[in-house]
């Protein structure tokens, strides 16, 4: 149940220590355990959903990128194994007023996960970015402590944010919300070969089914949000956003254990 084992960061730490067998941690937060995960938050690394989990997707089960990510997470942490990956779609910007150009971000207080890559990206674009736990976000938006946040549209709908942030910058598509299912390595190694095979197979099937479901529901989610009074806008200078963000990649590579 929500909140029983604590926040993502707390749950991830418990998996690392072995006091919890499994946790779901978004890539934006998992970088604190394994720097290589920060690469999943690079702006404009993924050009669309198919790049993530499509037939040739970087994170599709069995891909070379996925295998390398699994190895590096285990090497970095010594105790955390990547068992599954998922995405709820690309992060879009949700605000109290329309944002159609970079200059509109001036003065906006933006809630972010504790990701140095994402924070640097948004500050480069001109927003005032603040790291905040997800559990605190709804109240902060509701009370006006924060003006905006970014997530996939299904989060805006299912978590009831739309009365407070009813404008969406729809064509931003700078970064997907990726989550990792991590298990404690010592616990995993105690499983029988049959149990490991079952777990790995179930995880792979679930990943692809979830990806297909998220893709299929996007239009319906958008329609429901429009019916709730949410307005969708395009950013007019989105190519400038992209250029400014990609220029930061060399700095981000260092944050991810690269060069």
Language-model-derived ranges and their functions:
Residues 54-70:
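Signature of the catalytic double-stranded beta-helix
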């Amino acid at each position: 149940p929500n909140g029983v084992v604590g926040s993502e960061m707390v749950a991830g730490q418990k998996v690392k220590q072995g006091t919890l067998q499994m946790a779901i941690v978004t890539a934006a937060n998992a970088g604190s355990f394994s720097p290589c995960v920060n690469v999943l938050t690079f702006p404009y690394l993924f050009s669309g959903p198919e790049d993530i989990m499509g037939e040739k997707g970087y994170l599709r089960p069995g891909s070379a990128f996925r295998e390398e990510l699994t190895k590096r997470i285990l090497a970095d942490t010594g105790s955390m194994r990547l068992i599954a990956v998922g995405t709820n779609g690309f992060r879009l910007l949700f605000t109290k007023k329309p944002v159609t150009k970079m200059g509109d971000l001036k003065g906006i207080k933006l809630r972010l996960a504790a990701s140095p890559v994402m924070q640097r990206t948004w500050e480069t674009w001109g927003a005032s970015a603040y790291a905040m736990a997800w559990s605190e976000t709804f109240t902060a938006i509701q009370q006006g402590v924060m003006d905006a946040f970014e997530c996939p549209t299904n989060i805006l709908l299912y978590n009831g944010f739309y009365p407070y942030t009813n404008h969406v910058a729809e064509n931003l598509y700078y970064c997907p919300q990726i989550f990792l299912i991590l298990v404690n390595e010592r616990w995993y190694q105690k499983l029988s070969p049959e149990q490991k095979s079952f777990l790995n197979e179930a995880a792979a099937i679930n990943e692809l089914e979830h990806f297909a479901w998220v893709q299929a529901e996007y239009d319906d989610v958008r329609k429901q949000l429009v019916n709730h009074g949410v307005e969708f806008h395009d950013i007019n200078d989105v190519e400038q956003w992209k250029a400014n963000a990609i220029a930061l990649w060399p700095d981000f590579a260092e944050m991810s254990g690269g060069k």
